[in-house]
Amino acid sequence: MKLGKIALAMTALIAGTTAFAGTITGSSNVTFLAFDGQKVRRNTNLQVNDTNLHQVVVEISSIYQSGSDSAFFESQPIILTFEGSTEDIKILAPSLNSEFDIAQFKKSPSFKIETVSGKKLTYKQDFLKGEGFMPNSNIINNLANYNIGEGVAAVQKFALSTMPITMANNTNKVNKGKIVVQGENVTEQQLQYWFQQADKETQKRFLDWAKKQ
């Protein structure tokens, strides 16, 4: 029995539906790579209509002046975690026009996240690091591993990003207290996490289902 199949069934038991309204956009030098644990495809509209915790992975690119020549800069993926809004949200990265700008941004990236009415939203950020050859080629798995951990911008409820399902935060029936997950791979850890998140009745239904597989 594959853990992925079990985990997908588990998420189906506790997932809800969400209606969308406001949109999330970025300045011209911002590219969205992931949103709430899911891969973002080109020209995808990112939408929220609540004040729940949300997470994006962005990449910043810019053509800048290097001596008498022009050069191209592309940042490593950066995770931004913030509370949503029913208004449109804009994520603004600074203009990077010189080697000094690039060096400062690499050292300490800064952003502005604000609503269309001008309200500034606080956020947490961290670099999303990959491993092995071409570490940034698998953003979603890297993000799932990050969210399972204790990084400053981690959101455990988005750890199921490798599953082809959009999760909704179930705030009515969750177990309270610290959740501890152990396992040899991401799928096993994700399964443990969501099992502990579920209420007792959901856990029982899931175990009954698993025994029949």
From Swiss-Prot:
InterPro entries linked: UPF0319
Superkingdom classification of source: Bacteria
Leader sequence residues: 1-21
Keyword vocabulary terms for this entry: Signal
Pfam families attached to this UniProt entry: DUF2057
Family under the similarity heading: Belongs to the UPF0319 family.
PANTHER family referenced in this protein's UniProt entry, alphabetically: UPF0319 PROTEIN YCCT
Protein name: UPF0319 protein HAPS_0727
Organism: Glaesserella parasuis serovar 5 (strain SH0165) (Haemophilus parasuis)
